[in-house]
């Protein structure tokens, strides 16, 4: 997966709490098991006025021209609640998002995001609201998320600190998913296997 060190990008917001995985990627789009092609269905029921997805909802933030190309999403508490579908971070990443900022995340969604190279950043309610206010007030507002420094810099230059488990930070900084992490120990694994009796190999 793509490493995440420091990213500056256009920010978009969804000013709602408890955004669940069925809203992120509705169940009718889960037939694929590969990670690509889900971005077009992201927030389908909010982005489109029709079931076919031919009529964009002009009121939904992700459809507004000022947010085109956004790569950082800001939302409210308990983002990613609901079912454990891994398609949710797949859809967010396929849409072009690199980081999600919220006061809290559902635990399974949080882990799935890290495992798929999408950085979930927890900030306080007050800090999240400040980011939303600044983004709303300034078209083209960009936010910087620095995983090395564990900071988020707002459009006005305010700096907020965040925490993440050391193992998760290491994996994201080095672009290591579960397979990549295993392959990092390829020499040790091969050495161990070479010492196994033939009947165990």
UniProtKB/Swiss-Prot annotation:
GO terms for molecular function: 3-isopropylmalate dehydratase activity. Keywords: Amino-acid biosynthesis, Branched-chain amino acid biosynthesis, Leucine biosynthesis, Lyase. It catalyses: (2R,3S)-3-isopropylmalate = (2S)-2-isopropylmalate. The keyword Transcription does not apply. Pathway: Amino-acid biosynthesis; L-leucine biosynthesis; L-leucine from 3-methyl-2-oxobutanoate: step 2/4. CDD domains: IPMI_Swivel. Its EC number is 4.2.1.33. One of its GO terms (biological process) is L-leucine biosynthetic process. Transmembrane segments: none annotated. It is an enzyme of class 4 (lyase). Heterodimer of LeuC and LeuD. Belongs to the LeuD family. LeuD type 1 subfamily. PANTHER family: 3-ISOPROPYLMALATE DEHYDRATASE SMALL SUBUNIT, 3-ISOPROPYLMALATE DEHYDRATASE SMALL SUBUNIT 2-RELATED-RELATED. HAMAP family: LeuD_type1 (MF_01031). This is 3-isopropylmalate dehydratase small subunit. It comes from Shewanella woodyi (strain ATCC 51908 / MS32).
């Amino acid at each position: 997966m793509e490493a995440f060190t420091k990213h500056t990008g256009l920010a978009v917001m969804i000013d709602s709490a408890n955004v669940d995985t069925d809203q992120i990627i509705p169940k009718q789009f889960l037939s694929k098991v590969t990670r690509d092609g889900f971005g077009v269905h992201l927030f389908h029921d909010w982005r489109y006025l029709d079931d076919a997805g031919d009529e964009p909802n002009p009121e939904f933030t992700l459809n507004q021209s000022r947010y085109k190309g956004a790569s950082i999403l800001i939302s409210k508490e308990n983002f990613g609640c609901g079912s454990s579908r891994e398609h949710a971070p797949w859809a967010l990443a396929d849409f072009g998002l690199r980081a999600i900022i919220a006061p809290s995340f559902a635990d399974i969604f949080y882990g799935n995001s890290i495992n798929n190279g999408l950085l979930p950043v927890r900030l306080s309610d007050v800090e999240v609201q400040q980011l939303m206010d600044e983004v709303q007030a300034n078209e083209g507002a960009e936010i910087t998320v620095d995983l090395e420094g564990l900071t988020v810099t707002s459009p006005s230059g305010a700096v907020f600190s965040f925490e993440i488990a050391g193992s998760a930070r290491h994996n994201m900084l080095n672009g290591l998913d579960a397979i990549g992490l295993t392959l990092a120990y390829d020499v040790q694994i091969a050495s161990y296997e070479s010492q196994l009796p033939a009947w165990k190999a």
